[in-house]
Amino acid sequence: MDIFTFMNSASALFPYFETCVKIGKQTSNLPAAVTFTRLRSAGKKAEADMFSATKGINTHKGAIFSIGILCSALGRLSRNQWKMPEIILKECAVIAEGLVDSDFSNLTKENAVTSGQKLYLQYHITGIRGQIEAGLPAVQYAGLPILKKGLANGLNMNDAGCAALLTLMVSTTDTNLIARSDITTQQKTVQTIKEILIQTPYPDKQIFIGKNLSPGGSADLLAICYFLYFLESEA
C-alpha cells in the first residue's frame, strides 16, 4: 500500500460519491430508510470497485460508508440550508436511525465476520455506526472545532488537521486502532495522546509507526471534518 494505491482508489470511488448525492436528492421526499437502503446497494458496488482498483487492498472502506451517508445527507438537504455542518450531521443521524440495532442485534460468535462486528460482541463498541447514528458528535464537538481553531490561529491545513486527528482519537474508540493491536494498546495510546496534548499538538510519529498503529477510524472522521470545513467555507 502506498500513495498511488490511495490515488487509484480515490479515482475509482469518485463516481460513487456523486451517486450518493443523487440518491439523497431522489429520495429527499421519502423516508430516510429508503435512502439508506439504496446507499447500501451502491456501497457494495463501490467496495468492489475499490478492491478492483487496489488489487484487493482496503483503502477506503470506512469512507465508503461514512462519507457516502454524508453525501446522501447533502442530497436530501439540497433544497434547504444544506451547508451548515450541524444540520448536515443531524440528517446523517436521521438516515442512520436504528442502524446499530439492525446491524448488531442478531450477532453471534458464529456469524460475526468483520472486526467491527467482533469488537461489538466482545466490548459493545459501536464504532462508526454508533457515531453516525448519534450525528457524529466527535466531528461536531471535537474534530471540527479544533480544525477551525488551528486554522484561525495561523496553523496550516496539515498541522491543524494533525491536531484535529489527535483530538478525534481521544474522543472516540477507534476500532481500526484496536483491530491493528488490542483494546489495552488503544487505551494506553489514548492516554499517551492526552498527556502529550497538554504540552504540544504534535507528538513524535514514531509512537505510532513503531507499533504499527493505524487510527483509520479517526482518519475517516478527519476527512469528514475537512469536508464540512470546505463546504461551509464556500457557503
Residue ranges and their predicted role:
Residues 9, 35, 39-42, 46, ...:
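Generic hydrophobic, aliphatic-rich segments that mediate packing or membrane embedding
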Residues 29, 33, 53-58:
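Short, surface-exposed loop/turn segments at secondary-structure junctions
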Residues 39-55, 201-211, 229:
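Short, hydrophobic/aliphatic alpha-helical segments
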Residues 40, 53, 59, 65, ...:
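Generic detector of intrinsically disordered, low-complexity, polar/charged segments
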Residues 198-235:
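C-terminal appended segment following the main domain
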